[in-house]
Amino acid sequence: MTRTRSGSLAAGGLNWASLPLKLFAGGNAKFWHPADIDFTRDRADWEKLSDDERDYATRLCTQFIAGEEAVTEDIQPFMSAMRAEGRLADEMYLTQFAFEEAKHTQVFRMWLDAVGISEDLHRYLDDLPAYRQIFYAELPECLNALSADPSPAAQVRASVTYNHIVEGMLALTGYYAWHKICVERAILPGMQELVRRIGDDERRHMAWGTFTCRRHVAADDANWTVFETRMNELIPLALRLIEEGFALYGDQPPFDLSKDDFLQYSTDKGMRRFGTISNARGRPVAEIDVDYSPAQLEDTFADEDRRTLAAASA
């Protein structure tokens, strides 16, 4: 592919009010360095946990770090799809998105190193077939498909898989688990800081995915059916992953965690995404570009979690 023009040189310059560039600016303003997080006390807290508690936390971290690595590897075709559309703002944001995913991989690995975990961790995924289906099959297949087919429908399928299911349900539920483990017991302060930093980054990622689906649904109502169909395919798989994880620990899950609580939490996050996408139907596409409701939805989720967890800790 040769280049015939540069978007940053066009009349009027870049639209700094567009959501992708708002997210890009937000990421620059909130930059953080993994090496600045102090994991010293985490090692001491780790040694005090029971064997089952360490097993659960290791499995949870394993799922996170493998997921961050997967997206670091798989997100590039979405950048190419944005280039094919001539959407420089989205391409700029996705370069930051990919960098943040690599940084998340780094910081989870640093935490594992800090608490003394150095063995091969693949076995923690072997008992979770739903995880392997999502991260080793569904995710790479739908993202890599964009290399050959960058169509709006293919973009919606890819965004649903990653931004709405992996991040919008599973990662949020994982953060919820870390909060229940760490905040309510006042342990693992480094992990608490790690989750806070990553959660802030991924709210922007989810907002971009919602924005992308909304603009395609606004442009062509057939893409609403694509969104709805893909969500309905993957929500049961995401919930099955939660059930598989709890099934490994019998009637007494570590940290007194509740399977029903987690299933309800994850389902709520998934179902509420339908409304945000559906209200883009019939809207002017240009209006969607400067509509910040995707970011506001993620901030709402974060505020709700803060209030819920603060009440539980009181």
Curated annotation (Swiss-Prot):
Alphabetically ordered keywords of this record: Iron, Lipoprotein, Manganese, Metal-binding, Oxidoreductase
Cross-link 3-(O4'-tyrosyl)-valine (Val-Tyr), sequence positions: 71-162
This enzyme's EC code(s): 1.-.-.-
Binding-site positions, Mn(2+): 68, 101, 104
Alphabetized Gene3D superfamilies for the sequence: Ribonucleotide Reductase, subunit A
Disulfide cross-links: none
Highest taxon listed in the record's lineage: Bacteria
Names of the cofactor(s): Fe cation; Mn(2+)
InterPro entries, per database record: Ferritin-like_SF (IPR009078), R2LOX (IPR033908), RNR-like (IPR012348), RNR_small_fam (IPR000358)
Keyword Oxidoreductase: yes
Assigned GO CC terms: cytosol
GO biological process, one term: deoxyribonucleotide biosynthetic process
Record carries keyword Ribonucleoprotein: no
Catalytic class of the enzyme: oxidoreductase
Binding site for Fe cation: 101, 167, 202, 205
Disruption phenotype: Deletion of the gene does not have a major impact on sensitivity to frontline tuberculosis drugs such as rifampicin, isoniazid or ethambutol, and does not affect susceptibility to hydrogen peroxide. The deletion mutant survives equally well under nutrient starvation or in hypoxia and is not attenuated for growth in macrophages.
Role: Probable oxidase that might be involved in lipid metabolism. Is not essential for the survival of M.tuberculosis in stress conditions.
Record note on quaternary structure: Homodimer.
Protein name: R2-like ligand binding oxidase
